[in-house]
Each structure stands twice: as C-alpha cells, then as structure tokens.
Amino acid sequence: MKLEEIEDLMNKLGATKFRAKQIHNWLYAKSVSSIDEMTNLSKDFREQLKQTASVTETKIKIKQVSSDGTIKYLVEYPDGECVETVLMRFDNRANLTACVSSQVGCAVNCSFCATGKGGFKRNLTYKEIIEQVLTIQRDTGLKVTNIVFMGQGEPLLNLDNVLKALEIFNNDFQIGARRITISTSGII
C-alpha cells in the first residue's frame, strides 16, 4: 500500500496520520510479516487493524540457493498461483538486485523463454509485485537496492500495475529510478 492508502485506512479507522507513518515504516523499512510485529501500536489498535488489513499474502513454496549466493524463490499467492522471483548479488558488492515477475505465465511465448510455454494465466496486482520484494527482504533480513522486471511475464502488458509498483519501489522503498530496470520483449 502507498502511504496515501494507509492514511485513508487510518482515517476510516479514526486514527491519526502519524499512525499511517508508523505502519508505513513497519511495512517498508522493517518488512514485517504480521501486524502483531508492529509493537509501537497498541494491542487494541493492532486487533482493530487486523479486522481490516493484512500484511503478507504470499508464502515461499520453494527456495533454492546457488553457490554464488543467488537465491531463487517460487512464491505462492493465496489463489494458488506461483511466480519466480530472484535475489542476485554481484561482485560481493552491497547491491542486492531483485528480479521480479509481473504476470503469472506469459502470452508472448518467446522462443528463448520457458515461461510462455505454460501460457498466460493472469496479471499480477501491484501489491503482488511488491510483495515479491518484501518476501525477499523478510527471508534474508537484507534491503533490496535494485529492481529488474525480468521475471515471468511481459511487464508492458501489465503496465498499470507495473507503474504503481514502480512508484512504490521508488517512493516507499527508496530505490532510485536509476536502480530500476524494465525488460521488454519489444512491446511498446
């Protein structure tokens, strides 16, 4: 959720904008996996919040770690659909790159890519896209510094959700625009 969306939720719950900033910090700076971890919120408020919101909706189905430190995840969404997302490290630098998916399957069916062989199932929501990065951060305890849209799917065929995710990566995760890359098969 964007800060403005959290502020709207706080308004509906009769809470202050300050609470929205606290929750925003828990989500994006600390990558919590449950509302119960937001310990600077009162227990009563956390219970109220749990009635209207949830933090994580994905689970790691498979995790593979290579000898160079690259980690590949198969992330499962509540509807049972799965996508791959990868954490890459280069040259032992502090840069941590998340390769994210934008669709379940792909309609483009490029000859060099296995994803299209299974066909297109659906677009990911912007929340499902950002959840991939949050899943990586929760699992590793590390902050992702770069994003590449080179996972499953054609990002430009899911443009609205990709643009919303980009805005959150840039504004809320504090990842600079120069550290975000979108790869396309040629869709314009």
Question: Where do the protein language model's features map onto the residues?
Answer:
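Flexible, acidic/Gly-rich N-terminal and inter-domain linker regions that tether
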Residues: 1-94
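Conserved Radical SAM active-site core
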Residues: 83-188
